[in-house]
Amino acid sequence: MKYIYLSTLMFALSALLFTGCDNADYKANGNSLYLSDAAGTSKSSTVTLTENGVDINVVIRLANKMAEDVEVEVGYAPELVAAFNESNGTEYEAIPADKLPQGMTATIPAGEISTIFQLHIDNFATNGVTYVVPFSLGNVVKGSVEKSSAMSHFFYVLSKPLNVSVPVMQPYGYNEKVESDPDKKWGAAVDTYTLEAWVRMSNFNVNNQAIFNVQANNELYIRFGDANGPYNYLQVKAHGDGGTDTDRDWNPNQWYHVAIVYNGSELIIYRDGKRIAGKQVPAPKGGMVIDGLQMVSSGSMYFTAECAMSQVRLWNYARSEAEIQNNMYYEVNPKNANLIGLWPLDEGKGKIFKDATGKGRDMEAQRDIILRWEPNVTFGKKE
């Protein structure tokens, strides 16, 4: 019996000893430091860069409270941006280092679970580039805790939503249109392509209201309405195909983002970033060589609507759905090597639509096709 009592006592003392050790070490061994935003499924969020800049409130927290202050370096990881773009179909660039504060730390006081680090970024000219802040936790300089490797990075995308002047156009004469110089052939040979723009039509009263006619050795003709009404649908005729049609559900006086994508076998129509139609079409005979572009091109007999347009982009490859969705509300970098042409259509006056790529593929609005310019047009995300 004495042996049993002695064994029991020794076991109890051992348990007490180990429990005491666990309590002493718990805050260090069972704890971690991480970014609250990185704890969710999304690894990025969008913040708006205004004239006054932007304040980003970054929550840095512990899994468990500590009995001592915890201090951690805060910094940036631009080397992670390329992999992020690859995974998400984005074209972001890391914000220049001189736009960010350097050598900063954040402290979670003893007994607290978190702290807010406020990062202020002054407004700056983005020139068509969408920048991202690759926020990152650095070394823990005070406190017995380690940072979470999986949740120590987060991407804050700096958005400057489009706010532009747009031309409202309607053909005055039978052959009046907007077009690039027919005497300057582009000679852009492509295997796949994407044409995208913001478009608003005042009516769908007649057929064959052609918003685009690509000048090439193979047909690419984009219009609202064919022979059979009602005509509130988009049709794309490509490479001798009879046409790819959307549903008849387009509304007058509503802005739509339209993207036409040929991926080498299928012609796909996207509206507001979502696929709404698509089918197999013949391959371009002799390959596709694009030499020019026309807009609002079917003449006054057919084109009776007032058509507003903005941000016309022609690419030499098939853009993914993610790429379309992630870039349609913002400017794109005019230096992107995959652009055949980029026409923001935001001059606010005149008859020349400049090609922002610098390739010189400007377009001219003939005669009186521009009825007016509308200022301060924005394209915000639809909830």
What would you call each of these model-derived segments?
Residues 1-5, 11-52, 149-160, 383:
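Bacterial Sec-dependent N-terminal signal peptides
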Residues 68-81, 115-141:
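Contiguous beta-strand segments of beta-sheet-rich domains
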Residues 150-172, 330-383:
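Extracytoplasmic low-complexity segments
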